[in-house]
From Swiss-Prot:
UniProt-listed Pfam families: Tubulin, Tubulin_C
GO cellular component terms, semicolon-separated: cytoplasm; microtubule
UniProt subcellular location: Cytoplasm, Cytoskeleton
UniProt keyword terms in alphabetical order: Cytoplasm, Cytoskeleton, GTP-binding, Magnesium, Metal-binding, Microtubule, Nucleotide-binding
UniProt protein name: Tubulin beta-1 chain
Keyword ATP-binding: no
Length: 447
């Protein structure tokens, strides 16, 4: 069986991760003690992707929980599914990273990283055929961003041919915990560009807007935001957890989604977005789902896909529905909005259908888009970064942990390069390539 090792780092990562395990345990019929009470063989057919089987027929999440302070881990442990995790897989420090990337990456985190890698190694060794790793973390804090990226690069060293997948919560000015978020995020993106195969960008700003506008919640809590994130994660991983044809493992997903190695930052979306109480009042049709799923209001990253073009798209439909209708609707969307899809990747939209809907819904759809509009998100962080870095504000917190200003400059230019790469492919057309090749040939002849 193709296993995935799940790692959650920092406060945000652990809270989202805990929600994720609650939701998928529920979908697979596993209760808070790890016992199976399901009603369908499909629930167990690929259970090994995320769970180890322990003695007595219990299922234990293949999860490693990491933090530099004990607080969040304690609340996960005392939460509804706290007893399902393997106690040895909680690895935490006492000092905290104080929202400082340098502490997470170079000092405090570096001290803890070996004990985390021991646990990861133990999980990886007990796998039959490991397909890769997934990390949930935020980019705005210290542990998830600094230590999370440190773990990624260490795991990359040890398992260079395994897929590395992250669910990264990107900071936003509207929902800010700390003033140094732009620094932490830029330093993290610098790492993610080089060391991950797939990164789902989840954006607090977009989540807030969804809670506010669509779900009509007047004061959204982090609990509400995390609920949305876990819906999305459950949807994105459907193909991995239930038998199906398309994108059935992390590598196939990467092959379909990533046209150029650096451009692997995806915009997730979900439909239908209904507030927690009102699901049962109406059933959606496939056309409505498709329409909603491509709508900018349903994106979990605060970028408007209409400001860019899609390089690739994967869509996952869940529930009992007609495959034919799904294909028709997806083609329909592409034909109507053909200008929003690059024409130099034909058939760049892939669709999967899974029979098992999420709890409380008859059918749902999850959207994964690799759109050039994601550059808006990086631009936003970059502007805030530059504003502070120009004055060297707050820099002493980082240099005090042994960092060099050069590293900031490098991270900044790497992120700006990423933005220009997205821009370049947004403007590229199928005809330009021919001209470009002619130019190159001419240059070769001159030389």
């Amino acid at each position: 069986m193709r296993e995935i090792v799940h790692i959650q780092a920092g406060q945000c990562g652990n809270q989202i991760g805990a929600k994720f395990w609650e939701i998928i345990s529920d979908e697979h019929g596993i209760d808070a003690t790890g016992a199976y009470h399901g009603d369908s063989d499909l629930q167990l057919e690929r259970i090994n992707v995320y769970y180890n089987e322990a003695s007595g027929g219990k299922y234990v999440p293949r999860a490693v929980l990491v933090d530099l302070e004990p607080g969040t881990m304690d609340s996960v442990r005392s939460g509804p599914f706290g007893q399902i995790f393997r106690p040895d897989n909680f690895v935490f420090g006492q000092s905290g990273a104080g929202n400082n990337w340098a502490k997470g990456h170079y000092t405090e985190g570096a001290e803890l990283v070996d004990s985390v890698l021991d646990v990861v190694r133990k999980e990886a060794e007990s796998c039959d055929c490991l397909q890769g790793f997934q990390l949930t973390h935020s980019l705005g804090g210290g542990t998830g961003s600094g230590m999370g990226t440190l773990l990624i690069s260490k795991i990359r060293e040890e398992y260079p041919d395994r897929i590395m997948n992250t669910y990264s919560v990107v900071p936003s000015p509207k929902v800010s915990d700390t003033v140094v978020e732009p620094y932490n995020a830029t330093l993290s993106v610098h790492q993610l560009v080089e060391n991950t195969d797939e990164t789902y960008c989840i954006d607090n700003e977009a989540l807030y807007d969804i809670c506010f506008r669509t779900l009509k919640l007047t004061t959204p809590t982090y609990g509400d935001l995390n609920h949305l994130v876990s819906l999305t994660m459950s949807g994105v991983t459907t193909c991995l957890r239930f038998p199906g044809q398309l994108n059935a493992d992390l590598r196939k997903l990467a092959v379909n989604m990533v046209p150029f190695p650096r451009l692997h930052f995806f915009m997730p979306g979900f439909a239908p977005l209904t507030s927690r109480g009102s699901q049962q009042y109406r059933a959606l049709t496939v056309p409505e789902l498709t329409q909603q799923m491509f709508d900018a209001k349903n994106m979990m990253a605060a970028c408007d896909p209409r400001h860019g073009r899609y390089l690739t798209v994967a869509a996952i439909f869940r529930g009992r529905m007609s495959m034919k209708e799904v294909d028709e609707q997806m083609l329909n969307i592409q034909n109507k909005n053909s200008s929003y899809f690059v024409e130099w990747i034909p058939n760049n939209v892939k669709t999967a259908v899974c029979d098992i809907p999420p709890r409380g819904l008859k059918m749902s759809a999850t959207f994964i888009g690799n759109s050039t509009a994601i550059q808006e998100l990086f631009k936003r962080i970059s502007e805030q970064f530059t504003a502070m870095f120009r004055r060297k504000a707050f820099l002493h917190w980082y240099t005090g942990e042994g960092m060099d200003e050069m590293e900031f400059t490098e991270a900044e230019s790497n992120m700006n390069d990423l933005v220009s790469e997205y821009q370049q492919y947004q403007e590229a057309t199928a005809d330009e390539d021919a001209e470009f090749e002619e130019e190159q040939e001419a240059e070769v002849e001159e030389n």
